[in-house]
């Protein structure tokens, strides 16, 4: 371990890994610290949907940022594979966002003018996915809302960053960050280092660092419970989505089903009630799923914020300190754009001011400092 880095990134989930990669691309002397294994917690628990249209209901700066990040994924797989040899396992079948009522139809058809979104009648949906529920009224087909396997995206980011010169430290928690003259002091069990810039990207566990650095931004854990089943019986090529529940087909033959939303629950173990509610919604979309064999089940902690948007940007009083945390349900989707934005800020490049304003650390909608 060196004594000094140009940039230290705290948190080895998909957000921190993406930041380390984009900084390494800029030839920044970068270190990435993770208390456990890279991508081992919230990132591995995610289904990996790149659902800009599914998750973002308002056409604001957040939606624009999500669409930008979704577009970045189009060339990302090849770029990372060339450096890391890791396949991010992108599945390009698209998504059916299902309607089960006239109210659903009216809401979904507000997206008709968007690129890559098409309305399908009930008959057209069932022609494409014959095992979807016969109770649907139709669906919006979203061609660009594809999915990846998050653990492998994170792994690819980490290996690619390392190939470009970043130093990676697993099982090395950052204990403390403080301002020390012209440099920033970072304390770890393996030794102390200094950095010109520090980026906090520790998901729901970022609150400790906000507090150490004089900020009161709160993070709320929102537990999500998922399961996977083996699908040996029916064809399913597209993600099915309704009422914040999804069924995602994997190339392995598994279907990933999720997810609950339990605010304030720090437990990373699913409970029977949560799994039951997920399966109830899944059977509504795909009745045949009730006969499939269970593969496994798990839970993860989404990093929630007061207004549901992430913190991405500089410390309001110290431009050397940056934050990228609080991505809630959208960490996988937003990772490329977040990594590039943080890198651009550190490199003093021109950035989109609407995004900076929407995600600024001191926005009144989210926190009082």
From Swiss-Prot:
Annotated compartments: Cytoplasm
SUPFAM superfamilies: FAD-linked reductases, C-terminal domain (SSF54373), FAD/NAD(P)-binding domain (SSF51905)
Temperature dependence, free-text field: Optimum temperature is 45 degrees Celsius.
GO cellular component terms attached to this protein's record: cytoplasm
Keywords recorded for this protein, A-Z: Cytoplasm, FAD, Flavoprotein, Herbicide resistance, Oxidoreductase, Thiamine biosynthesis
Molecular function in Gene Ontology: FAD binding; glycine oxidase activity
Major subcellular site: cytoplasm
Recorded consequence of changing residue 244 to A: 2-fold decrease in catalytic efficiency on glycine and similar catalytic efficiency on glyphosate. 60-fold decrease in catalytic efficiency on glycine and 210-fold increase in that on glyphosate
Pfam family, one: DAO
Noted pH dependence of activity: Optimum pH is 8.0.
EC number from the UniProt entry: 1.4.3.19
Textual note on the cofactor: Binds 1 FAD per subunit.
UniProt enzyme class: oxidoreductase
Cofactor: FAD
Metal-binding listed as a keyword: no
Listed pathway(s): Cofactor biosynthesis; thiamine diphosphate biosynthesis
GO biological-process terms attached to the record: amino acid metabolic process; response to herbicide; thiamine biosynthetic process; thiamine diphosphate biosynthetic process
Applications reported: In addition, transgenic plants that are able to oxidize glyphosate may represent an innovative bioremediation system for the soil treated with this herbicide.
Protein family membership: Belongs to the DAO family. ThiO subfamily.
Subunit structure comment from the entry: Homotetramer.
Annotated PANTHER family: GLYCINE OXIDASE, SARCOSINE DEHYDROGENASE-RELATED
Role of this protein: Catalyzes the FAD-dependent oxidative deamination of various amines and D-amino acids to yield the corresponding alpha-keto acids, ammonia/amine, and hydrogen peroxide. Oxidizes sarcosine (N-methylglycine), N-ethylglycine and glycine. Can also oxidize the herbicide glyphosate (N-phosphonomethylglycine). Displays lower activities on D-alanine, D-valine, D-proline and D-methionine. Does not act on L-amino acids and other D-amino acids.
Name of the molecule in the record: Glycine oxidase
